[in-house]
């Protein structure tokens, strides 16, 4: 019996060696915003290259934390790491961290108002007022004034926000900080903030779920989550004074200016961008790669993945409600991949 068990142990061990040699495992964690496209990409790339990329959709804040602590090989975030976070990463890991934009997306104001199925218009002032808790009724003049002919109820507004560290929150609060000095001074921007009002949901999925089950609620999710969950979302008044509902053209228009002046570290904000057709709550989302990998095989695989994702992989993005990267950004990234050692 012992001999049989010993033989089984050897056989299973050999099987493990074969599996290990046939497939490379890379671990990553971070943003939920791009998870639908990342899931598709990692599956496609893995099948073609024998690389299994295990990605945890845990939120940008957790992704930054995990990549800094070295518990994953790469991170992902919808908000670029700030200077303090980069310094903390360098101190912990003895190398730098690089940002690589992968796609463009949009945060949208989503709501669940019984009896109202039309797409509402939201001014910047109305959104800031709602999330500050100063506008508390759906028929408030700040909302009704931009939605003539819509019978809005006198019901209390229930604000829903993210409860976890979130790049989607970073985009939303970055926008609110640009259009409202009160928001900037009292709340500010970040992957996590001290919310003045509201209920918290974990992940884009959690916010979408809360919205669907909470009458008279308003929240924010990435565009694909609104579409997948069949949640109504509204148009937002942009910097040019036009109400724009999020779509691929509007997101691309928001990125047009930044594409020509992209900084070398790719850390840029495109919320409240100029342009008559620009959707104002748009953003790049980034993969976070160590400047120097400890494992050369993983380094080569991730460099190949990024190269594929920002070129051939862009053919997949529009079907999932993301916008393609501008050519100027792709060209700059391909050169920047040389910094990954």
Language-model segment annotations:
Residues 14-20:
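Sec/Tat signal peptide C-region and signal peptidase I cleavage site
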Residues 1-8:
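Bacterial N-terminal signal peptides that target proteins for export
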